[in-house]
C-alpha cells in the first residue's frame, strides 16, 4: 500500500474517534426505522442535539397539539446531581402562547418550595411587554435581556428574554445566574 499514513495507526485512531464521539452523537432505537447515518450527519452539521431535555417529554404532545408558535426548549438545564427529579408542568398553552413551570414535584404550581424555573413563549403583539434588563449576546448574534432575581421572603426567577421570528421567548431560574440562563438559551432546540 503506497500511503504516507501508516496503516497501523488507523485502528487506534478510529477507536479513539468512536470513543470520543460515539456515545454523545445519538441514542437511536433501530425499531423506530430511523436512518442513523442521516441523524449523525444532521447533528454534526447543526452542532447540537435534536432532542430536547427528557424533562419535557411528558408535555411535548400537548404543546405540539395546541400551540402554533415555534416551540423552543433547552437541552441544557443546570441542575445538580444531588437534586430531586425535575418535572415540567404546562401552566398555559394556547395557539399563540405557552408557559411551562419547572418544579421538583409533578404538581408544583411554581411555589417557593418546589419551584425551579419557568419557560415561556408568546407571539409578539402590541400588548406584549418589551424585554427589559441588561442586554447580552446569545449565539447567532441574537440579543437577549437579562433581568436579575430579587429576594424578599423568597427569591424570584432571574429571567432571560429574547425575540425570534415574531415570538418572544423567556427562560427563568429561581435565583438563577446570568451564565446558567445564557447556557440554557444557547441550547434551545425545536422538538422534532
Where do the protein language model's features map onto the residues?
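Short, solvent-exposed recognition patches
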Residues: 35-164
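Surface-exposed amphipathic alpha-helical segments
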Residues: 165-192
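Generic short N-terminal amphipathic or hydrophobic helices
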Residues: 6-9, 25, 33
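C-terminal segment of classical bacterial N-terminal signal peptides
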Residues: 20-29
Amino acid at each position: 500500500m503506497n500511503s504516507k499514513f501508516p496503516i497501523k495507526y488507523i485502528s487506534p485512531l478510529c477507536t479513539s474517534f468512536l470513543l470520543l464521539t460515539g456515545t454523545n452523537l445519538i441514542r437511536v432505537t433501530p425499531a423506530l426505522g430511523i436512518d442513523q447515518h442521516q441523524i449523525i450527519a444532521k447533528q454534526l452539521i447543526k452542532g447540537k442535539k435534536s432532542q430536547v431535555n427528557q424533562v419535557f417529554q411528558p408535555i411535548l404532545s400537548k404543546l405540539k397539539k395546541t400551540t402554533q408558535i415555534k416551540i423552543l426548549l433547552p437541552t441544557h438545564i443546570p441542575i445538580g446531581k444531588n437534586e430531586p427529579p425535575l418535572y415540567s408542568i404546562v401552566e398555559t398553552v394556547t395557539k399563540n402562547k405557552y408557559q411551562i413551570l419547572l418544579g421538583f414535584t409533578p404538581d408544583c404550581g411554581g411555589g417557593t418550595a418546589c419551584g425551579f424555573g419557568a419557560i415561556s413563549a408568546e407571539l409578539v403583539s402590541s400588548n406584549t411587554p418589551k424585554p427589559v434588563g441588561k442586554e447580552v449576546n446569545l449565539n447567532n448574534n441574537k440579543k437577549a435581556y437579562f433581568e436579575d432575581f430579587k429576594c424578599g421572603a423568597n427569591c424570584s426567577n432571574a429571567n432571560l428574554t429574547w425575540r425570534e421570528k415574531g415570538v418572544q421567548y423567556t427562560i427563568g431560574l429561581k435565583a438563577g445566574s446570568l451564565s446558567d440562563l445564557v447556557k440554557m438559551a444557547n441550547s434551545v432546540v425545536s422538538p422534532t
